[in-house]
């Protein structure tokens, strides 16, 4: 009779445990999963998606490959994810608000409900300036924009990006005009302000955090209703101190795949979200370090949470004359004032 060595027994037990852990899922991927990040490396979407990818790998026992495909405000990579086979092996990442407003901008035909959403964090934007900037607070910045319409340069990741939508909300509420300078991602937009190419950036706290902590950017306000406590820096006041009537919805980020992938894919990923992502220390630590909110939602819950920012941004773009299609035409209701 053949006997197993103690090492072999240990290996077999380890295999049984790991394979059993994976076997609990209806979908067991047989090849690497690709997540397309439709922005440049180093931005907020890229950062958080890499954290989430590691957790998915651990849960499913399969590699997750991140591919950066920036272009056209994230719509290029998102379209590539949609055009790939709907088999669960190709996903896109980003802000749900971008995903929902692409039809209004004439960039993509697919609407928010055509995608299965798996959210991970909610990010807030920050008004950041170069340390040498003459603007010491939001009031001074807005006064400059009023005095010099269309002259103060603001760097964002592109049309309909989180930074752009945040600045549009401010501009409409304050009645100012600015010079919009776009980049292929939040990180390049932040670097542009650090380097003095632009005067202001309104990209996300997650993208500005390191530069703020290093003293290479000076935050004027968080574009939100509450102060932001940024680890290693301190308190950033809310823009509502100067603009109390500004309307702000929550900006959710995550990954998504077409709704018509095999049902076992969505069932399995829903389980992964409830069991793994919702308890992820790595993701919680990321959120705390980057000034983000931990929001591990999926299914109908994710759709209901995401639609608020989609409505806000779609109508902001339309009212600013930057939409190709009326939100009404693609079923996006105007938010209640």
Question: What label would you give each PLM region?
Answer:
Residues 1-8:
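Bacterial N-terminal signal peptides that target proteins for export
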Residues 42, 96, 130-135, 156-161, ...:
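Short coil/turn segments
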Residues 151, 155-236:
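Ligand-binding pocket segment of bilobal, Venus flytrap-like solute-binding proteins
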Residues 30, 56, 80-90, 102-188, ...:
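Hinge/capping helix and adjacent helix->loop/strand transition within the periplasmic-binding protein
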Residues 24-111, 151, 175-199, 204, ...:
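N-terminal (or domain-start) structured segment
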Residues 18-23:
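Sec/Tat signal peptide C-region and signal peptidase I cleavage site
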Residues 208-280, 327-337:
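C-terminal lobe and pocket-closing loops
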Residues 30, 266-337:
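An extracytoplasmic/periplasmic, membrane-proximal ligand-sensing/linker region
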């Amino acid at each position: 009779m053949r006997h197993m060595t103690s090492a072999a027994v240990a290996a077999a037990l380890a295999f049984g445990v790991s394979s059993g852990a994976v076997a609990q899922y209806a979908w067991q991927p047989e090849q690497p999963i690709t997540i397309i990040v439709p922005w440049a490396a180093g931005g907020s979407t890229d950062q958080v998606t890499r954290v989430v990818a590691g957790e998915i790998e651990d849960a499913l026992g399969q590699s997750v490959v991140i591919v950066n495909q920036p272009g056209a405000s994230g719509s290029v990579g998102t379209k590539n994810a949609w055009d790939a086979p709907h088999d669960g092996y190709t996903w896109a990442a980003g802000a749900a608000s971008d995903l929902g407003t692409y039809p209004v901008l004439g960039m993509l035909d697919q609407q928010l409900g055509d995608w299965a959403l798996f959210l991970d964090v909610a990010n807030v934007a920050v008004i950041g300036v170069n340390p040498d900037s003459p603007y010491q607070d939001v009031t001074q910045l807005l006064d400059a924009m009023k005095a010099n319409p269309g002259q103060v340069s603001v760097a964002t990741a592109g049309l309909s990006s989180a930074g752009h939508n945040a600045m549009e909300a401010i501009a409409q509420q304050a009645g100012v005009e600015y010079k919009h300078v776009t980049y292929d991602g939040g990180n390049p937009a932040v670097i542009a302000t650090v380097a003095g190419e632009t005067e202001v950036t309104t990209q996300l706290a997650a993208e500005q955090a390191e530069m703020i902590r290093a003293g290479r950017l000076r935050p004027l306000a968080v574009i939100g209703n509450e102060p932001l406590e940024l680890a290693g820096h301190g308190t950033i006041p809310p823009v509502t101190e100067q603009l109390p009537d500004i309307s702000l919805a929550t900006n959710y980020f995550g990954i998504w795949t077409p709704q018509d992938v095999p049902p076992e894919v969505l069932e399995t990923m829903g389980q992964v979200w409830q069991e793994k992502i919702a308890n992820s220390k790595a993701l919680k630590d990321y959120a705390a370090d980057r000034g983000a909110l931990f929001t591990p939602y999926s299914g109908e819950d994710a759709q209901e949470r995401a639609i608020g920012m989609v409505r806000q941004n779609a109508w902001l773009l339309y009212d600013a004359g930057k939409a190709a299609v009326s939100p009404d035409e693609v079923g996006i209701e105007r938010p209640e004032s």
